[in-house]
Amino acid sequence: MNSFLEYPILGSGDSGTCSARAYPSDHGITTFQSCAVSANSCGGDDRFLVGRGVQISSPHHHHHHHHHHHPQTATYQTSGNLGISYSHSSCGPSYGAQNFSAPYGPYGLNQEADVSGGYPPCAPAVYSGNLSTPMVQHHHHHQGYAGGTVGSPQYIHHSYGQEQQTLALATYNNSLSPLHASHQEACRSPASETSSPAQTFDWMKVKRNPPKTGKVGEYGYVGQPNAVRTNFTTKQLTELEKEFHFNKYLTRARRVEIAASLQLNETQVKIWFQNRRMKQKKREKEGLLPISPATPPGSDEKTEESSEKSSPSPSAPSPASSTSDTLTTSH
């Protein structure tokens, strides 16, 4: 990050000229070079002050009428009120310290700044620019002295790093301003919707009787715990009651046969017989019906199965004949 400080002084006539000089700045502490400002020549103990008693001196001076580059080192610090004084033994008119207050704003380290300006010889300098309050480090300065008539020149120092940063932030904010506006509108819209009474949709309502999802079989809904209740017709109920009167328990073959004859499925017939048996027991407990002889469950089924599988058995003696036989033997 080597930078050079250029001080070209262009003079005319009898007035001495100072060759254009470029000095590299020290990277540890930013350097500021000085050039003898006089009406006749550049030489001797040349110095000028920047800030509160901070002296910037140039120990070596070289008089050349051609452009040369000589490295020199000088340090400077800045303060709120910048005072600049020029002193030279051979300077014709006596120039006192030009004290003034220049507003400046600090900018961060490692920022580059371009410096350009014009200085005629032995003239009061006007300083305006931005310098950091502590020591400014690692800056590229390109400074020049341009000769002309003795007047009020200006030494301009611009902090391009800070300006670019502020410009970038400004453009960034400007570019994002419509986005922020749209985002704020989007944020406000849900609030306005929530403030209004909420709309109730059909899917939000609680269904007390949800629709049946069971597959419709040949005889209605099958295989679901919440199956639709079967509405039996009068003919179906009559046939089921007749069968229940003779057989409280059905075999699977008989159940299939009844289901086919009544256009019902096997499950419906089975459930109807289960419910009918529970109803029968309930009535017997209440005393509405006489208690039927207790038959173990499945006895009728076993008898039916045995009757279906076995061949017809020989006729058994009737109870009347058996009693008559016993009476005759007793006599």
UniProtKB/Swiss-Prot annotation:
> What Pfam family is a match for this entry?
Homeodomain
Localization annotation: Nucleus
Motif Antp-type hexapeptide: where?
200-205
Q: What is this protein called?
A: Homeobox protein Hox-A1
Name the residue ranges with Basic and acidic residues bias. Answer: 299-308
In its keyword annotation, does this UniProt entry include Glycoprotein?
A: yes
Bias (Basic residues) occurs at 59-71
Induction data = By retinoic acid.
Share what the entry says about its subunit structure, partners included.
Interacts with OGT (via TPR repeats domain); the interaction takes place mainly in the nucleus. Forms a DNA-binding heterodimer with transcription factor PBX1.
General function of this protein:
Sequence-specific transcription factor. Regulates multiple developmental processes including brainstem, inner and outer ear, abducens nerve and cardiovascular development and morphogenesis as well as cognition and behavior. Also part of a developmental regulatory system that provides cells with specific positional identities on the anterior-posterior axis. Acts on the anterior body structures. Seems to act in the maintenance and/or generation of hindbrain segments. Activates transcription in the presence of PBX1A and PKNOX1. The homeobox domain presumably directs sequence-specific DNA binding. The N-terminal portion of ERA-1-993 may be involved in interactions with one or more other regulatory proteins. Such an interaction could regulate either the DNA-binding activity or the transcriptional regulatory activity of ERA-1-993.
Q: Which residues does the annotated region (Disordered) include?
A: 57-79, 279-331
Glycosylation (residues): 149
